[in-house]
Amino acid sequence: VYYSNRDIRIEERPLPQIGAGELLIRVEASGICGSDVMEWYRKDRVPLILGHEVAGVIEEAGSGLRYKKGERVALIHHVPCLKCPYCLSGHETTCETLRKTNFDPGGFCEFLRFPEINASCGVLPLPDSLSFDAATFIEPLACVLRGQRIAGVQKGKSVLIIGSGIAGVLHIHLAAFVGAQPLVATD
C-alpha cells in the first residue's frame, strides 16, 4: 500500500467482492508507470494501491458477462463512454467518463475488482503465446500509438524522439515499424 515514495507497506486487505457485470481478477503482472512514482500526483489520495498496467486471470465473472473463470486478460483502467462528442470524434482521452473509471484496488495486489463499466469494454483477451509481463506493455504502447497517430508519424517522415525511457523506446520501435526515417532519438 502506497503512503508516500518512502513509505510503501505490505498489508492484508479483504478479497474484493464483485457484483453483476463485474470481474474478479487474479493479478499476474502489473507494470510500473511513471505516474506511479510522482509523489505530488498521489499524496492527496493516500493510502492507495497503485498499478494500472495489469494482466491477469479471471477468477470470477459476475452475472451477465460472457467471460469465464480462467481466461487470461489484460485490463484497461480508464474506459471512455464511446457516446459523447469527444468519443465520437476520436478524442476518447478527453471523455468525461474516462477519468471516472478505474479498478479497485490498483494492480499492485493479488486480486482486484473490475467494475461493470470497465468490464463492458476494457477487457482484452490474451493469447497463450503472450506472457503476462509482455501484456503489461499494452497500455503504454496504446499511449504511444495514439501519440504517433496524432503526430502523423508515417513511412518516410522524419521523427525525433526526445527521451529514451520506456515510452521513448516504444516510440522508437513503433516509428521504425511504420518506416519513419530518418529516425533520431536522444536521451
Write out the residue ranges for each language-model feature.
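NAD(P)H dinucleotide-binding glycine-rich loop of Rossmann-like/cofactor-binding domains
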Residues: 81-158, 162
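Conserved acidic E/D residue at the C-terminus of a beta-strand in Rossmann-like folds
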Residues: 186-187
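Short Gly/Pro-enriched turn/cap motifs at secondary-structure boundaries
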Residues: 3, 14-15, 46-51, 100-106, ...
